[in-house]
């Protein structure tokens, strides 16, 4: 156990070193408190339509009741695949309230990626947006799923929803054709209304989420997050923000939810923390629509809390119309998911007057581990201090603690750390030290004041716009393509996305083209995993035992041979 915790002396006044965390409380109990305390408050605004806490309570209970009517065993997995719309929150909360396990699915996934996640989790139910139904249809017969619930984006928007759905299908034509047995989301709610909801007793040690993350082998693994893990991280983050929020207790906080809530950062820092605080969640279904996001911010200058990633902040500050906004109510801007660039952070503060407090976390830690104090006056470039109840040590390759200021692997112990990887005991064993610290796989160092800095990443992980990409997965896909003899994938710097994927290919088919490779990858990989640059070479550098040396591959440049 680490007894030296230099970060504690730098905690803001009012933030305790140790929180007294509830031992008999589930995440559902925490949410029920908010439903009871704030029934008339607005909980959600999505696509111009709002829902109160009372309405969210009723709708999520109806969905929970519907799930119970399916006679699923407690702990069954429910996969959910939505952008940031009200249906996601209803399905997620409903599954938790029914005593089931939420499997968040990236809505950008290809059929191959979706198939793996559904089968690995053994999900019995899939709830998804109609926009992605054609993706599931391609692998429907290959999965463990027994029941599919499909929703159109406009389903809960009243009369306006009819127009939204009509436009999506027949004007914008963004809904590809699909056909398979399913239940409509609205029908599920009606069926749930007819079924008496039986509130289950949920053990805090029960699984709440299987949050899938890449592994060092490139195989996507489910981080097993218990109710007590996620509950702890919500309470830790709440306590950490208290110094800037303590004067707002009588006012409703407004959270901008631009990051996808299927991602662990937004799930905790936007959705669950927002509901815990009785906040209003402004849902952004398409954060790539920067013009639409700026219009939303113009309509809601009262935004108080803005979690984001560097690419989002970068896109906003480079729009002239963003600089005209008056975001004087902005209390906290949290940067996570990828490294923040100082130029972007400084530009953000110059426009908004609010510094970006950079943090650090992982899917395996629910996610927040470290974050800068929200009282900072300017961007620091550091990932901040460990949260209350959290211990961080820097270990060398020999497993021994590194001296202050020297780099090693960031290792974490705390109530937010996962129980392990779903059905992968050997992989779980690899990522924990003998005394119970989670080995993050990231290289960093801690200074004498307890501030942590990220230096580099172990292995060769690539971070594209905040999303982790593992070269082995991309290489495996490329290697399966006829005409490719060998390949190696590396990350290269990119001004907007941080990094992009670059592939070096040795071909055994002379007429293989860049376009051929890009089309193949489009069918097999979600967009951020696809190579943006492709270089054909005659051979790849290897070690004396035949291992491709990525560090040497990076030196090859852009010249094809």
Predicted segments — roles?
Residues 45-51, 64-112, 130-131, 258, ...:
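Conserved AMP-binding/adenylate-forming
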Residues 52-54, 208-235:
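Conserved AMP-binding A3 loop
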Residues 57-62, 190-195, 223-247, 313-314:
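Conserved structural elements of the adenylate-forming
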Residues 109, 126-130, 298, 414, ...:
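AMP-binding/adenylate-forming catalytic core of the ANL superfamily
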Residues 175-212, 219, 244-254:
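Conserved pre-ATP/AMP-binding loop-to-beta segment of ANL
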Residues 231-254, 262-304, 319:
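Conserved AMP-binding/adenylation subdomain of ANL enzymes
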Residues 279, 303-308, 317-378, 391:
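Gly/Ser/Thr-rich phosphate-binding loop
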Residues 360, 379, 393-411, 430, ...:
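Conserved beta-loop-beta connector loops within the AMP-binding
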